[in-house]
Every structure is written in structure tokens, then in C-alpha cells.
């Protein structure tokens, strides 16, 4: 056990520091913004330092572990720890949240509350990724929903209350299944409740009970991922939310569902996962095609990007369902890759909206000459989204393909069919992404808005775009930087139960 409570400090620091904003001037928007950015940068540096000097990549076991008795009455522990599966998502959370606070500079209404909610969301997300106790995981999972709901309902488009209500109904409703699963799995077959994830990983259950647990957790994580048909909250939410909130949703929140699928469904319930994986494979394949074919019909720019996120999450589901070393590694790489790409596209969509106050693609056109820097960045990041070689998305999707090909679980005909359908989805992706760029930047200038300001990307926006682009290219050129973090943990998960 680590002597210094690194993870506790990393989890508690953002929300604690955010609470001090109550003492800052009410109208001091610049003070609030720079204070929040300073907190995020300090948190990211602290996280990076703690991981660089204390995390051993060749060790698949839990590291920086903390185990404190929290509530004596119900034998509840504050258990924290990281491994190769969670370290990437925690660093991604820190990076995207820091950039999202910088992207939120134009927010002036209730900026103190806005930035506090972002920091509270930050704590909840890192807490979810670093929890080693099932009940603590559930508490952090729920804690993160509260600031998200308020960010959605108070800042955004005209239908923001509708989208926020839809979001909370879906996520809070699915959390009931998560809570039932947590209580059921902890109380089974033991005189004392066991919530420790390390002990639960070695627990075995009757087949029927394991299937019931699996379904409960699957529903909760399918809503967050999202997996069709539980995805309908996502386009509405992205369509109405402020773009800095969209960056956090696409970059981090969706990845929590995929993380839960691996951490709980795959690691704790291996036999049920082996039984359900063919069905998940089918759903993931349908999801790629469905979202890629639905996206071109969306007039709203942010909704079109949201459907592209649904399509890309299909690759993660397929990688998890392949039950192979390359497949799971590819899924983890896609989690990180899409975190950057999704956040970048929503940021650029937001910067365009700041200038023309339009979200409907058929009302745009001919902006390439007026805003060449934004046009260039949007084009490059669209290429990243359609998995151009040299970008992170290409490597992730390619490794997922290898995962399906090398899988021992599926017949050759099944594998050929799945790869064929995935290939169709990859062909549809350039259609909706390139048509989106064409409608925005090419053709005649259709914009008819009074007093619109056509100034190009400023230093802040250019810095933000390049900051997200660099890791996308870096991972595309050298994916082993991410894969080496998780490879030992992936082998540890897969060695437990498959085909043994």
C-alpha cells in the first residue's frame, strides 16, 4: 500500500478548490475563469507527477492503493487504486477537462457556478475511474450526474431543459439497475458484505445469478456508452448543451460506460460476458451502420457529430466482445482516441457557432475563405474521425479488426460477415463527415445573420485545437505509448476465464 494518499488528494482537490470560488467576487468572471484553469492545470500536473514516479507499467496489479475505514456502521471502506485500465482514462479526464475550462471562456452568465460544476464533475469522474470499492464506484458514478444535469439545464440552447431532463431520466433510471447489481453482488454468498473489487474478481456465482447481475450492469453502462437502443438521449443532449459541456460529455462521460463494461462486466462476471459477447458483437456492428447512416440526415451540426460518436463507440463494443488481446487493447485505445477526437470536433463546432449563431448545416456555407484556420483544423480533425492513417482512430480500429480476426470464439463465416458490415460503416463515415465539411465551408455563402462577426481563430482557440490534435497524431504514430500502459492488465483479465 502506498504511504502517501495520492489518489484521495487527486479526487478531492478539484471539488474542494471549486468550493472556494464562493468567496471570489460575484462579478469577477476573469478571476473565476483563471482560477478554474489554474486548478485544472495544477491537478493535471499533480496526477502526472504521481503516476510518473509511482506507477510501474509491467505490474498488472492495483497500484497507489489506499484502504481506509470510512463508515463503521456498515463496514464501508474508502478504497482507491489504479491499474493499466484506469490510468489512461484518468489522464484523459485531466487533459480534456483542462481544455474544456479554457474553451468555456465565452461563458459569462453565472460563470462562478458554471466553473464550480465543471470541477465537481472532474472529481466525480476521476473518483469513478480510481474506485476499488463497488459502493464507492456507485457513489462517484451518481455524484458526477448532478453537475452534468445542471450544466445541461442552465447553459445551452432553447430546448436545454428538455434535453437535461431526458439525460437525467435515462442515466438516473439506469443507475437503479447499477445499485441493485452492486448490492446483489456484494451480499451474495457471504456473511459479511464484500465490496472490494479485488476480492469480487475471484468470486464465482451460479450461472442464472451471474446472468442477472450482468444484465443489470449492462443496462447501466449501455446508457452511458451509449449502446443502441439506449442512445436517444445523446443527440438531444449534444444538440442543446454548451460546447465546453459537449467536450466533457464526448471526451469523458461516454468513456465511463465503456470503462464499466470492462471493469465490472468483463472482469467480475467472465462467464456471463462470454455468453453475451456474441449478442454484443451483433449490437456493436449494427450500431456502426445505424449511426453512420442516420448521421447524414441530421440538420443540426452538433447532432451529426453526436451520431458519429455513437458509431465510433460501436468499435469499442466490438473490441470488448471479441474476447481477444488485440480486441480489448484496440477498444481501450479507441476509448482514448475518441476522447480526443470527439472533444475536438465539438469544440470546433462551438467556435463556429460563436461566430455565426447557427447550428443548422443547410443555413451555412462558404465559410472557408472567411475563417481559414478553423476550416483547416476542422478538416484535419474530420480526417482523424474517419480514421485516416497516421491518426489515432486508424490504429485503434485496425487493432479491433485484428481482434475479430484472431478471435477463437466465432466461426469464420461470422467473422467475415462482421468485418464486411464494419467495412460498410467505415465507408459511410467519410460520406457524412465530408458532406458536413462541404455544407459548412464550401459553396456559396448562405449565411444571412445581422451583425455576425467573421473573425478567424484567435490564439486561445488555435492553442486549444493544436493541443488536442498533437496527442491524436502522437498516438497514431506511436500507439504503444497507450497500449503499453494497459497490455499487462488486459492479459490479466483475459487469462481468468476464457476457453480455459
From Swiss-Prot:
One of its GO terms (cellular component) is chloroplast thylakoid membrane. It is found in: Plastid, Chloroplast thylakoid membrane. It is an enzyme of class 7 (translocase). Disulfide bonds: none annotated. GO terms for biological process: ATP synthesis coupled electron transport; electron transport coupled proton transport. Keywords: Chloroplast, Membrane, NAD, NADP, Plastid, Plastoquinone, Quinone, Thylakoid, Translocase, Transmembrane, Transmembrane helix. GO terms for molecular function: NADH dehydrogenase (ubiquinone) activity; ubiquinone binding. The keyword Thylakoid applies. It catalyses: a plastoquinone + NADH + (n+1) H(+)(in) = a plastoquinol + NAD(+) + n H(+)(out); a plastoquinone + NADPH + (n+1) H(+)(in) = a plastoquinol + NADP(+) + n H(+)(out). The chain crosses the membrane at residues 4-24, 35-55, 87-107, 134-154, 167-187, 211-231, 242-262, 272-292, 305-325, 330-350, 386-406, 416-436, 462-482. The keyword Plastid applies. Its EC number is 7.1.1.-. It comes from the Eukaryota. Pfam families: Proton_antipo_M. It is a multi-pass membrane protein. Belongs to the complex I subunit 4 family. This is NAD(P)H-quinone oxidoreductase chain 4, chloroplastic.
